[in-house]
């Protein structure tokens, strides 16, 4: 039975085959969940991100790349770049949807069974939380139904507001 689990806590401590990183386009680490994943995972993640940068020049908004997970309780880190919120008239919704879809393409390609997502773009990028949660759940429900190997999607919420929002939207 495929399931969606909502967790409040630190994504770097949640065991899953893949952890999604809300990265920036440089792939060099940053603040929020991105910084936490790089710190907890260790230098191997940054080294792999630098190889990707050298090959393709970073990661565009809406795209995703995959690396090993270093010291994290996972096999992979999927780095995706969500959009910065400006006013909702610059394709932010479509770009956030594409960021989640890009992650699921990598999940499918690598036969991943369990993946943990943070709340992409809702921190410093300022995406309205309920709007982001609705987009995330629409994509997740569609992809979990289509994917042959995926069994569990963890939504790991750093704050109580996102946690409560996801619980409300799922019920």
Curated annotation (Swiss-Prot):
The cross-references to SMART domains, in alphabetical order and at most eight, read: A1pp
Looking up HAMAP family in the UniProt record yields: YmdB
Segment forming the signal sequence: none
In terms of superkingdom, the source organism counts as Bacteria
Task: From the UniProt record, give one GO term of the biological process aspect.
Answer: purine nucleoside metabolic process
Q: Which InterPro entries match?
A: Macro_dom, Macro_dom-like, O-Ac-ADP-ribose_deAcase
Q: What does this protein do?
A: Deacetylates O-acetyl-ADP ribose to yield ADP-ribose and free acetate. Down-regulates ribonuclease 3 (RNase III) activity. Acts by interacting directly with the region of the ribonuclease that is required for dimerization/activation.
Please give the subunit comment from the record. Homodimer. Interacts with RNase III.
Give the protein family: Belongs to the MacroD-type family. YmdB subfamily.
Q: Name one Pfam family in it.
A: Macro
- Asked if Membrane is a keyword of the record, the answer is no
Task: Write one Gene Ontology MF term.
Answer: ribonuclease inhibitor activity
Read off the lineage from the record. Answer: Bacteria, Pseudomonadati, Pseudomonadota, Gammaproteobacteria, Enterobacterales
Instruction: Tell me the keywords, alphabetical order.
Output: Hydrolase
User: In which residues is substrate bound?
Assistant: 10-11, 24, 32-34, 121-125
- PANTHER family xrefs: GANGLIOSIDE INDUCED DIFFERENTIATION ASSOCIATED PROTEIN 2-RELATED, MACRO DOMAIN-CONTAINING PROTEIN
Q: Which reaction does it catalyse?
A: 3''-O-acetyl-ADP-D-ribose + H2O = ADP-D-ribose + acetate + H(+); 2''-O-acetyl-ADP-D-ribose + H2O = ADP-D-ribose + acetate + H(+)
Annotated catalytic residues: 34 (proton acceptor)
The entry's protein name is O-acetyl-ADP-ribose deacetylase 1
Originating gene: ymdB1
| Enzyme Commission numbers on file | 3.1.1.106
